[in-house]
Amino acid sequence: MTATTQPFVYRYPGLIPGILRKRYKRFLADIELASGEIVTAHCPNTGPMTGICELGAPVMLSKSDNPKRKLAYTWEMIQLPTPEPTWIGVNTALPNRVIKAMLLAKQIPELADHYDTVRPEVRYGTENKSRIDFLLTGEGRSPLYVEVKNTTWTKGKLALFPDTETTRGQKHLQELIDIVPAAKAVMLYFINRGDCTRFAPGDSKDPKYGELFRQAIAAGIQILPCRFAVSPEGICYLGLAPWESTEISGVG
């Protein structure tokens, strides 16, 4: 676990330990509990989970008491041993909840002076068919569009996004490029593990995304790779990671 003295920006409910035995159909995972029972948990992550979906690894589950839910358990995090035991957030719905709370509390210094109001899931883009994660507005200030991306793939201590080809991610970058300079825009990468110290685009997985990332920089879009330490108790904000414009320049 990555040690930190930072306060929690999110606290988990009581979590249940287990061991990952199988992930399948994207949304399902078989987890062995301490009792030896195998339960099927919801996997709230549609991506390939490159480099983090290791069978036999320790995991943590949350449990819902809602009788209407088909699956009571949700897979929240996994622990990997490289280079020291590190918890990695699996639930891709959680970063937006954490960032919303941080924005409301003005806990991201680079953005805190630029808004009075936080609006989630606002329509924008071509024919108004897309939704931005957060629109920040304030009197006398340009609108600030914030897109959040969960980031868990690494090479050493270098965090990389994306971990697979993402036409959706490409579209989001292009639409942010298109709204500048009429408005301001931020790409916020939620580094959902505490063992990374730098960030770069994942050119080797999605060269087109890497190209758009560099176009976004040239257009004036702000890049905020936010580092978080994850533990079964909660999530702590560690500040920004330095970033590189290409994967090759970031490796090493």
Swiss-Prot record:
It comes from the Bacteria. Signal peptide: none annotated. InterPro entries: SfsA, SfsA_C, SfsA_N. Transmembrane segments: none annotated. One of its GO terms (molecular function) is DNA binding. It holds the Pfam family SfsA. Belongs to the SfsA family. This is Sugar fermentation stimulation protein homolog. The gene is sfsA.
